[in-house]
Every structure is written in structure tokens, then in C-alpha cells.
Curated annotation (Swiss-Prot):
The modification N-acetylmethionine is found at residue 1. It comes from Rattus norvegicus. HEAT repeats lie at residues 392-428. This is Sister chromatid cohesion protein PDS5 homolog A. Interacts with the cohesin complex. Interacts with WAPL (via FGF motifs) or CDCA5 (via the FGF motif); the interaction is direct, cohesin-dependent and competitive. Interacts with SMC3. Interacts with TP63. The modification N6-acetyllysine is found at residues 1145, 1210, 1289.
Amino acid sequence: MDFTQPKPATALCGVVSADGKIAYPPGVKEITDKITTDEMIKRLKMVVKTFMDMDQDSEDEKQQYLPLALHLASEFFLRNPNKDVRLLVACCLADIFRIYAPEAPYTSHDKLKDIFLFITRQLKGLEDTKSPQFNRYFYLLENLAWVKSYNICFELEDCNEIFIQLFRTLFSVINNSHNKKVQMHMLDLMSSIIMEGDGVTQELLDSILINLIPAHKNLNKQSFDLAKVLLKRTVQTIEACIANFFNQVLVLGRSSVSDLSEHVFDLIQELFAIDPHLLLSVMPQLEFKLKSNDGEERLAVVRLLAKLFGSKDSDLATQNRPLWQCFLGRFNDIHVPVRLESVKFASHCLMNHPDLAKDLTEYLKVRSHDPEEAIRHDVIVTIITAAKRDLALVNDQLLGFVRERTLDKRWRVRKEAMMGLAQLYKKYCLHGEAGKEAAEKVSWIKDKLLHIYYQNSIDDKLLVEKIFAQYLVPHNLETEERMKCLYYLYASLDPNAVKALNEMWKCQNMLRSHVRELLDLHKQPTSEANCSAMFGKLMTIAKNLPDPGKAQDFVKKFNQVLGDDEKLRSQLELLISPTCSCKQADICVREIARKLANPKQPTNPFLEMVKFLLERIAPVHIDSEAISALVKLMNKSIEGTADDEEEGVSPDSAIRSGLELLKVLSFTHPTSFHSAETYESLLQCLRMEDDKVAEAAIQIFRNTGHKIETDLPQIRSTLIPILHQKAKRGTPHQAKQAVHCIHAIFSNKEVQLAQIFEPLSRSLNADVPEQLITPLVSLGHISMLAPDQFASPMKSVVANFIVKDLLMNDRSTGEKNGKLWSPDEEVSPEVLAKVQAIKLLVRWLLGMKNNQSKSANSTLRLLSAMLVSEGDLTEQKRISKSDMSRLRLAAGSAIMKLAQEPCYHEIITPEQFQLCALVINDECYQVRQIFAQKLHKALVKLLLPLEYMAIFALCAKDPVKERRAHARQCLLKNISIRREYIKQNPMATEKLLSLLPEYVVPYMIHLLAHDPDFTRSQDVDQLRDIKECLWFMLEVLMTKNENNSHAFMKKMAENIKLTRDAQSPDEAKTNEKLYTVCDVALCVINSKSALCNADSPKDPVLPMKFFTQPEKDFSNDKSYISEETRVLLLTGKPKPTGVLGTVNKPLSATGRKPYVRSAGTETGSNINASSELSPSAGNRSREQSSEASETGVSENEENPVRIISVTPVKSIDTVKNKEINSDQSTQGNISSDRGKKRIVTAAGAENIQQKPDEKADESGPPAPSKPRRGRRPKSESQGNATKNDDLSKPVSKGRKRAAGSQESLEAGNAKAPKLQDGAKKAVPAERQIDLQR
């Protein structure tokens, strides 16, 4: 730096001594520009020492050295190029300010400004603590701070420039090598300026705040700490300045006031962390910003407040409730990123402020249903993260939100929810990290996770399997620990979870068998048939992997590798071998994965897919050692030495569930059971009093004991007498399993079964029915398993005892308690024996598999008579209503069982099929429920002919929502299975008539044409009932127009009109009813589909059993329903009576007064008009109803006997032109719900028989009593199966509709399907998102 040549010293200072000389301290020579720098430094040091030793009281010295003081402030010194000179001069000047305080010796404002700027520049020397001059710099700082020298600058007009320079200098030099004294003096210096001045300018405030910005904070943490302490110290003074700054930027939008305007939110966060009082006036401004119209601005404020509210020591939420409530409102913001940020904040808030969980719960609930997948996902992450930190942080409601999301429509959300719950279960239940109370809180997780196995998605199933192997029962545990974990898990699962787990093992075992069959195909010579079989097997395997489309390619590639690599094949064979241990399986999986890995390809989707396959088929849990450990655990439970109570399971429950577990594993891992020790333990179980335990033990022997006879003769000799005893005197279930066990594991089965058959068949005594049940079960199963040996002897038993003695006689009188159903334990032994007798007849026939002796015809006539007589075969009116329900169910189920055998299906007449079908409309809820479940079970396994699927159309008449919902689920499942089967099996095209779901239409039309409630083909009310039943089926079939199926179904209905009813081809009325149903079907199809008018791809084939061949030159263009009727059917004009008139069929059942119809409507009521409305049956959640359809869980419990009466309901207004909402059916509002607004009695209420002396409905005059309808002539229906029938006696037909008391409930509550053309727009759902204004 260039300096001007200094003038003589006298001129430099302006004030000299009396003789014109500057007075220097003793020993100090004159300091001028003539001397060398070193000499100058030497002399200045002596001056510094002199001023350092002076104090304010030395008036003479002060006066003496005043010229020197002025001299040191000359330009020569202030601009000296030598830093040591400048430092010494600065020290002198600082002491001069101290000595002469409070008045400075310098009067010129410009000079003062130059001096303080000079001193400030020298303070930069504080930066280097290792400098030899550091102590002198420190002395300078200390002196300035102690004297508060800079306060002199307040008198200067532009003092702000000095202060800004000072603050910037101090913040820039502070570093981690400085001790606390340096920082303290800096703080003293700066705080005195802030607190004693008139205010802090924006530029000065910026010099402080800039150190809080993250970028600066990261560069120099010491400057951040200095600023932080400074702000804390001066909070009272500086708060107003800070408020003004934020007010300018946030409210007035004047970002130009400061270069820090763009960092306002960062500054607010830091200032809040330093001291919330700094922002007392700023927080209301943030509330204003939260309501900004700019989404990005709201997002920035939400991010800021999330940090402020969520920080650990923050009490902002309690101190500023309005701001907190305003912030919570952003959870419902219209801007997706704002909602997302709000949800992310919740995790920190839950962890740091558990007391705010209650406020957050409701908002998280809404966001857990957010339309944005990412937000739903983050809700789960938020809750799970907090729960993993401490389970006490989340309440049951929050965990419930995660539970709900396991059924989310998006895979990513479902996966996060499932994995999160699995981690919580492992942490708190398996490891018990927070004690028993926490474990109890999340004990439901295991059941919920396994329930997800019921979902259709293969991804869900695979994830459940992974969770089971890693979290519920970790496969990497030692065998004993792993089996203990499984043993007590199985004992504590709910029934649905147990079924899911069993299904999981079954699916894995099935996949193992597919892979085994694939490897067997590799061993065979190459041929076209072999290649075709291999391709089919590969497609089956691919269906069991994620993304089946891609999986097909990968499985084909894997198959090629298997074909080329024999060693890989041997590894895979070992993996699926029944003798493979868990440790071997782990080695095999790793070895196969290593061989297929490609080091050059870090992400290998092919390898990932193969790993999925290997994980599913590898026996990672169960081997011989594991079974042995399970058996030992069960033995400990039997001996009472196990930890059952500690694990929260009673010993009896542990034994029973342990044996059930072993029973399930005996299906999937039979080889692992083959040891004397295991079988000895099972023999011990056989001797236990618990019937369920013994039954399970027998079944395990049946599944696993194939080598007992040859390898373990001692076990064999002990087992045989026990099996004989169980077959003769055990429970019915034990008897069945014992017979099957003997048949499965012994070579001399004929001798063994004969030793059971002969004494049992001789000792049958109908007078002691309680001793009949087990013998009947055993005899039935023996005749089914060994028909060649026992079919003939059984014929005489059937003719002389079963039919003549047991079924055709009523020895006891049933209770007349009015109940239509009783629990199993209350059913009379005689009825139980009759039910088993019916089952025996079926098993006997199923064993023979032929009708050479015409026994099947006789049996079918007997079963038909049972249905026609409503279960009271003898018609002596001695049997109770609940017992009649049991026998109707048994008869209907028996016909359905026989229909599964082709030779018997052929001889079942249409009349008998119709009688069987009507059981699904029985008046007893449980009969309808159980029959529907049996029907579904057989159809879904493709065991029953397609015509039986038509029976589900009658479910439209069921008064209970649950039953209709179940029926619809069954239809969906059956139709999807049949379509999938046709796709997967090319050969199935030859059997399209029996497989294609659309072919159910002609069977349905024929069945409805013969509905006993369809008596008048032009009755609009009856036609509406028919339409409801048709649409119940057609709606499911018409969901998709696959292969132009709509036109195909229309063509079938049109073709039926060209035939005659094969059941009564010459009866004009019968044919007219058939053609009328066809026209109703055509009307429905035309109104629901615009695609049905296209040409059908093929001409449908009609079943010969139900329709005659079309006659030549026969045309039938006649419309059997008028245009007015057509409009009524489609527009849904309410009718005076409900669809349920069909369910509550007016039968004059035995033991009850004949049902009377009113003259005007033909749907009378026997319910008092002044009575109250009964509660409707509750509708289940989607999850429950879907599970019910899969698992057959009971949908109705027993109800106390009570008479429920209702008030007839007036017709509602016509509901027209609304769009049909297909989702209604999923919720249970199907078919007749779509057509009628139903008022349904509870399931128990409908099973209460009205007393005979109840008054008829007073709404209309009673019509004359009608005879019972529907029994066919004796020559057709009875034959030799009944004895002494009086044909003239009035009898009722086989269907008993749901109790007559419900008929008036439904009257007039119709809401028919709506026309699509004039569809009324649905009211949009209320929006959960807060539209920001």
C-alpha cells in the first residue's frame, strides 16, 4: 500500500508541548519516519508499556502525553505498511481511549472513524493463535471490550459502518483454537454495541444472522456458536429488530430489504432453536403464510414448522395452539407435496412429543386413505418408525391404520404395511423387548398377516411366506427354538389364520410336487408329448411366481439350464427330496444361486425369480429333526412340564393345537414322521380322553404310516386293536379316520375291515339311536373304500335296516319349540342317526360307481321324498322343525354329492335337480348357508356339473345380505376358476359345454321357469322376481365381454325359444313360462350391454336333458312380455310386494296352519301390524366377507327363541335412471338389494316359527286356504322309497322359503335395476382435501 510522505512530526499532531516538542516516555527517543522499522517497533513497545501502566487518575501524565496520543493517530501510523507497527499503535490507541475516558482526545469525527476502522482491521490478527503477537492482539480485544471503547462511535453519524466492519471481523476470525476468554470478550464488545445503541440496523442484523445460514454454519461452527450466544444475550433488545425484518419479508413481501430474504425459513428455524422468544412476534406471521395461495410457499412454511413443532425440546404446540391447529390443517392441503411433508413430520412428532399423538391420529387417519399412493405409504412409515422406537408412542388407532393398509390397492403400500407389522411382531412378541404388555398389544399382528394369504395376488402370498420364514418363525433359529416358536404360534392363532397357514404349506408342497414332476420329465426321452407336458408344467410353476408374464420366460430359461446342467438338476432334486434337511436345503439354495449368478450383472432379474422359486420349495422349517422336536414339546405339554402357561396357552390347547399342527405337517412332510419315538408319542395321544387329539393322531398315522407294517412291527401290533376300537366305539370322526387308516397302511386291509364290518352290521339297533352313529359312519366308509367286498352285504343292510327300519320310522317326538335350527349338541340322537344313514347311502353308492342294481334310482327317489315332505318323511308330524331342517339339508347335500359321480348325474331327473336347487332357498338360515358352502366347495373343485352353478341364481331371493354377498363371491370365484382352467388347459376346449361359465345360462333359464313361485307368466311381480334372479347371475357373467360372450348368451336365450321344455314338451303352459323367462333374460341382456347385438362367434349347444331339438320350420318370434311389462322391469317401478315373497314361500308345512295369501296380492302376512321392526342383519366388512367365501366360516350363531314381529313397510318412491354401481355387490348389496330396499331380520330371528294361533295380517281379508303345492304323482317321485303314501293327502314341495314372517317386511321395498341411457350422475363424495384459498 502506498502512503504519502509524512510531514514533520510537529505538523502531524497539531498539539505540541510548550517548547514545540512531543513528550515521549523516559528512554524513548522521537518516533519519526527517519528511523528504521525495527527501531520504530522498539520505541513503540516502550510507549505501549507506558500507556499500559497509566490509569485514568494520572492527570499530569495525561496532559503530558496528550501530544503523543495525537501523534499516534496520525496518518503515518494508521497507514503504516508494517503490521507490527500497526498492532502496537492500535494497542496504544486502545489504552489512550481507556486513559482519557469518557472523553476521547480526538475531536474530529472523521479522525475517530479512521481510528476505529484502523483498530477493527487490526483485530483480524486474532485469527492466528500461534502467532507470536497473539497475546498483544488479545490484549487489544480485551482492552476494547473492557472499556467499551466502541461506544464512543454512537456519536458518529456513520457509526454503522464501523459496527458492521467490527462484527464481520469478529465473526470471521473466531475459530476453534480460541479459548472461552476470546469469545467472551468478543461477546462483550458486540453485545454492548447492540444493547446500548439506539437500535440495530438491518445491515448489522444481517452480519449476525448470516452466520446462522446452513452454508455458513457448516463452514465455521464457531461463528455460528458466537452468533447464537450473542442473540441469546441480547434477546430483549434484538427481538424487535428481528420481528421487523421478518415482517418486511413475510408479510410485506419486501425481499430487497436484505440479502438474507431467501433464507428466512432457515433463519426462523435456527432462531427458534436458539431462543423461541426471539420469534414471539414472528409466529403469527407464519400462520398467515400457512394460508398462502402459493403451494410452494405453503410447502416451505410446513417444512419449517415441522422442524419447529417436531424438535425434541420444543413446546411450541402447547404454547401456540392456534398455529398448531393451523399447521394440522395442512394435512388436508390440496397440494400433494404439502400433505406429504405433513405426514413425514408426524414421525418425529410422535417420537419427540407423544402427548401430541391424539391430535395427529385423526389427521393420519384421513391421510391413510389419501388418493396419493406416496402419502398412504408415508403414513405407514411414520407410524411404524415411531412404533419401532417405542411401542408406547403409538396408540391402537394408529396401528389400526397400518392394519387397514395391508389391503391397500397398491402393492407398494401393502408391502410396507405388512413388513412394518412383521418387524413390530418380531421385536415385541418374538424377542419380547418391551415386556408382556407390549407383546399383548401387537399379538393380533400374526393373525392379520396370515389372513392376507387369502388375497388373490401372488405377490401378497409370497410376501406372507417370506414374513413367516423371517419374522413369525425365523428359519435361522436352532431347531428346538424354531419349533418352540412354531408350536406356540400355532396354538395362539385364530381359526382363519390357522387355515391360511395350512394353505400356505399346502401351496408350497404343491409347488414342490410340480418341480418334482418337471425333473421327472427331464429324465424321460424327448418327445412331442413330453415337451407339451413340460410346457404345461412350466406354465403352472410360473403362475406361482411374481409377475407370471415375465416369470414364464425366466422359468423357460431355468428349464433350459436344468436340461444342460446335470449337477444343477441333482442339487434341485436334493432340495425337493422328502429326506432333505433344513441345513441341506440352505446349502442347496446357496449353491444353485451361486451357479446362476453373473458377476458382471449386479441386478439379475432371472436370478431373483429363481430365488423366489427356491424359497418357496425349500423346506426351511420342517425336517425329521424338527418333527422330533415338535413331538417332544407336545410330550412335555402332556406331562405338564412345558412352558405353556408362560406362553399364554393352556396345556389342553397346546396339546390339541400341537397335534393339529402335526396332522397338517403329516400331509406335506410324511417322511419326516417315520420314527419309533414319534409313533410312540402318537400312540400315547390315541389313549387320551380328548376326542380331537385322538382323531388327529389317527389321521397322522393314516398319512404317514405306510412303512409301519414292514419297519415297525411293534407299533403295528399296538395300533391295530386301537383302530378297531375307535372304528366300533369311537366318535364318528375317529371312526372315519380309523377305517381310512386301516385301508391306507395295512396290506391285509380286507381282513381288518371285515372284522369291523361284520359285528357292526349285525348289531345295528334303531331303538338305541345314540349307539348307531359311529357304526353307521364306519359301515359307510368301509363300503366306500372296499366296494367289491362289501357292496353286496351292504345292500341288505340298506334295504332292511337303513330305509325300512331307520329312515321310515319316527321313534321319538321332537320338541315343539318353534326353532328352525338347533346346535349340534341339542339335535336328537335319532335325527343324527338318520343323517348318518343318508350319508351311508351316498358312500355306498359312491363306492359302487354303477347303477346296475338300480339302487341309485331308489335312493334318489327317497331323497326327493325327503325334500318334498320338508324333512318329515313319515309325515306323522312327530319330528321337530329344527330336526326337519337337518334332514332337508342332508337330503339336498346327498343329491349334490351323488351328482359329482358321472354315472349318477346321468340318472338325476330335472325334477330331482330342481328339488335339490330349492334347498338354497330353505326357510332356515343355516340350511341355506351350509348348502351354499357345500355347493361352492364342489363347484370350485370342478366336481359338480355346470348346471349346479345355476342354483346360485336363486340366492337373489335370500333375505339376508350376507348370504347374497356370499353367493356372489362364490359365483365370481367359480367363474374365474373355470375361465382360468380353460386358458391353462388347451384340451379343455373339447369340454366347453361343461366348463364355459356362459353355458350356465340355459340351465338357469330352465331352473327359473320351473320355480314353484313362478305360477303366472304375465304377473309383473313374479316376472320381477325372475329378472332379479337372472341379473344376479348375468351381472357377474357380463362383467367382461370376453370373446363376445354377451352376444353368445343372447344367442342361447334366442335358441331356447326355438325348442321345447324337455321336462314337459307337450304342456303349453310350461313352454310359455320357459319362453317368458327367455324374454326376460333377453330384456336384461339387451338393456345392460350394447355389445350383445354383434354376431355370436359360434352357435351354442343346448343341453338335451332340458331342451328338445329345434323342430324344422319352427320359428318363435312372439314376445312373451308386453312393452309395458318390459318398461316396468327395467325402470324399477315399485311393486306392492317384495321379492322375498318368493323366499317366504306360502307352504302349509306340517305342524303349522296353512299359509294364507291375501286376495289382492297373493302375498299375505301372518304378522301383527302393530309390532315393531326387527333389527336387520349386520353386513360384514369386505375383508370378512371375502374370507368367508374362501374359508366357510360360520356366518350365524345360535339365537334364543323369541317371536319377532314387524310392521309392514310402505312402498318407497320409484327410483329411476340411476347408474348401476357394481361396487354395491361387493359390499353385500347384491341382486335383490339392487332391486329392492330390503328390510332383513337377523339370521336368528328368521329361524323362528310363527305360532299357529297368531293372527293373520289385518291389512286384507284372508283368502281361502290353499292346499300344499308341488308334489308330483307317486309314480314319478316316490316309487319304492316310501311306504303307504296317500297321494290324495296334501303335501308341500321341497323348498321351504325363508320364514313367512319376513314376507311383509319386503313388501313394496323395490329398487329395480336402472337404465344406463339416462343414468343419473352420482353425487361426488365429499372431498377430504382442504382447497386452499
